[in-house]
Amino acid sequence: MKTRATVPLILAAALSLAACAHKPPHGEPPPPPPPPPTETGDVPAVPLNEPPPMHLVVQARADTPIVSLRLVFHTGSIDDPKGKEGLTALTAKLMAEGGTQRLSAAQLLEALYPMAAELKVVTDKEMTTLSGRVHQDFLPAFLILFTDTLLQPRFDPAEFERLRANALNAVRNGLRSEDDETLGKVGLDALIYAGHPYAHYTGGTVQGLQSLTLEDVKAHARRVFTQDRLVIGLAGPVDANLQQTMTSRLSGLPAKGAPRVALPTVKSSAGRALILQKPTLSTAVSMGFVTPMRRGDPDFFPVAFALSNLGEHRQFIGVLFNELREKRGLNYGDYAYAEHFIEDRGNGTFNRTNLVRTQQDVSIWLRPVVPANAVFATRGAVYFLERMSNEPLSPERFDLVRGFLQGYTRLWEQTDQRRLGQAIDSLYYGTPDFLDRYRDALKTMTPESVQAAVRRQLSPEKLAFVFVTEDAQGLAQKLKSGEPSPITYASPKPPEVLKVDERIIQQKLPVRPDAVQIVPASGFMER
């Protein structure tokens, strides 16, 4: 038997249901009226802290034989020149993976293999991280390999062409064709940061990558991989000799780089919707907005708490996960983030470290849903976000989330690499002992203080939306019309679920009918 939640068509029934919807459950006080919408203004760039050149972060411990090294450069895709999008990421890849003056790329891999050593590079909007791990027995040889990638890169033309081809393939086939979830997230960046250096894909655009030359890469390396942009992280069995060796070798980098990019104010994207059209069986949904709030803001911890309640990445405790996946079977999972999130794959379900950003974003991600349920699922996410403004969490729910975070935040610092990353992030944000302070803040939060922060920072009116779907015109029409979005289930649902559905079906989506744009995914990130 199919269960269908519909909007009543008879006026009397509609009025009756509306009255019921406003009656609180027996014994509970009525919820306060919704707060007035928060101002949806622009977000200026407040500069990050700048550590001194080649600042050392040392976390020595004698109970491990593994040495961890982390070199974080204050450079990222914001440093890509106009028309050469992808230059920073390709430069970092070619230096880290393309061999050194002494060793070809293949020989570099052969040298690392018997050491069981790790060497990898990651580029984001403002930060590029070169990290390494090795047993202390192999440290002297590894240090030479590790630092030579920066000091004596091979810049092999064949490796340049190989890595550029990989980067082009990642845009044309990976981003556009194979990964609707990432496509939606990159689309959200493009929408909420339109006209800003954050807007383009970190890996580059098709035309940007095609325009690059090996000489571009060589010149860019001298401009941005410099001492004045570098923080050095060392952990494990670290002694004074290792610290001296690292700083001495890395002093071979250029002392000063290009001037920092002056980031502009981010214009509000409230109410905008971008639909990326492509052949696909499902609809991926991302929503969010740029926020002036970042680590160090008094509201950051309570807002992070609220969004953890809504849904930590891949955690079953989240409201969205339980309401949209478990109770309604809409998709695989639904999550919310207080700052930009990229999963640290291979190290749990946590956010990567060293994604420091001057202008952060808040986002909600719905894993792909059946197209017929896309608007309902989107409304559901907005409904449960708005509910946190309208009513505080119950004491039982509040204590559950607080207990979860007291333990879960310790997993964010369970490896030397993650501890180094957290410490380096704190330099830029000015938030020493960040996770300890978060756990201390949890002790003094209340349901009311969290609700107050949500009202100040998480107005649904600020949201912009991105969808990846095939029937773009049909979805656009639904978004523009604002009409209710009934849902049909394959199996019966409890009355309490259907009662909430009646509210979700009519939940206002803050989408402006004149700001719905359709873009073919086949041309996304072309230039």
What are the residue ranges of the model-derived segments?
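Short acidic/His-enriched helical or mixed secondary-structure segments at domain edges of catalytic enzymes
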Residues: 166-187, 269-282, 327-331, 335-348, ...
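Acidic/histidine-enriched segments that form metal/cofactor-coordinating
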Residues: 21-34, 109-220, 265, 270, ...
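Histidine-acidic residue clusters that define the catalytic metal-binding segment
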Residues: 30-47, 189-230, 257-265, 293, ...
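Buried hydrophobic packing residues in well-ordered domains
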Residues: 53, 71, 89-91, 112, ...
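An aromatic/glycine/proline-enriched structural segment found at the starts
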Residues: 24-39, 194, 226-227, 231-294, ...
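C-terminal motif of bacterial Sec signal peptides marking the signal peptidase cleavage site
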Residues: 17-19
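Bacterial N-terminal signal peptides that target proteins for export
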Residues: 1-10
